[in-house]
Amino acid sequence: SNTRDAASKVVTDEWWFGFEQEYFFTNPDGSPLGWEDGEPRPQGDYYCGVGADNVSGREISEMHLQACIEAGINLTGTNAEVALGQWEYQCFGKGIKAGDDLWMSRYLLYKIAEEYGVGVNIHPKPKKGDWNGSGMHANFSNEEMRTAGSEKLFSSICDLSLIHI
């Protein structure tokens, strides 16, 4: 069900969200992009990598970044991740628009990848073995957290983690 109306009564533009969406580009057979000749060398050099031996899918990632910016979605960066064919982008938003922008950024990612004949996999652990999975980290702050902060505020956040994590 749509909880937008209820959320709009609580969430304000003073609430800032930063999402870090990790994903793999995939070949039509489901294997990660760049793994066409089998399993690549161990992960490590791929993180924020450059060079054809270290990245696969950069053009798609950059096209996605540009499309989101043109659509008014505030992507603040993109980078190659720990495994070959794995990428991340960072999406910043305020209030309810943050969630909308995350969903639309994913939609644009899938559509642009389709134009290149590849898929997108956001599964948390798409490859078995000693390969990193993909997450979607969520960062949050409000005015108090960005300005004054306090030990009391920090402690209350830690207490909430016992219920929510």
Residue ranges and their predicted role:
Residues 1-162:
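Glycine-rich, acidic/polar active-site loops that bind/position phosphate-bearing ligands
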